């Protein structure tokens, strides 16, 4: 029986996320990696996003990657167009290692 123990603090889910970015015109992929805690906002406005895409078809805040204890989900923001593995998604989507995400003209390949 513990009586004087401090309350247990719940830590936020976090994990390494690696994305390989390529554009329609680009030949090579660009590697982007970060230790993501809780969420990652993707968009075209560097002041509002964690990952900024220089893409005229990307909204200032386009989508959010959410890290949860049981995986990673992707959610479009404000009905923005997002595709995963060639199919449009209309809401929250559970991502798998190797999934391909299309935002505007930019393709992102996910490595977990």
Identify the residue ranges that each predicted region occupies:
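Intrinsically disordered, low-complexity acidic Ser/Thr-rich regulatory segments
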Residues: 1-56, 66-68, 95, 102, ...
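Short, solvent-exposed loop/turn segments at secondary-structure junctions
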Residues: 49, 82-83
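Amphipathic hydrophobic-ligand
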Residues: 58-60
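Short, basic/aromatic beta-hairpin or loop at an interaction surface
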Residues: 71-82
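Short strand-turn-strand beta-turns centered on an Asx-Gly dipeptide
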Residues: 84-86, 104
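Eukaryotic mixed-charge, acidic/polar low-complexity intrinsically disordered regions
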Residues: 89-99
């Amino acid at each position: 029986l513990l009586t004087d123990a401090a309350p247990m603090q719940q830590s936020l889910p976090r994990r390494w996320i690696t994305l390989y970015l390529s554009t329609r015109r680009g030949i090579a992929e660009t590697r982007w990696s970060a230790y993501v805690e809780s969420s990652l906002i993707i968009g075209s406005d560097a002041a509002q996003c964690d990952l900024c895409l220089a893409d005229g078809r990307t909204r200032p805040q386009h989508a959010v990657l959410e890290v949860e204890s049981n995986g990673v989900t992707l959610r479009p923001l404000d009905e923005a167009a997002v595709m995963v593995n060639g199919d449009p998604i209309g809401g929250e989507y559970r991502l798998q290692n190797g999934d391909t995400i299309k935002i505007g003209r930019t393709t992102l390949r996910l490595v977990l």
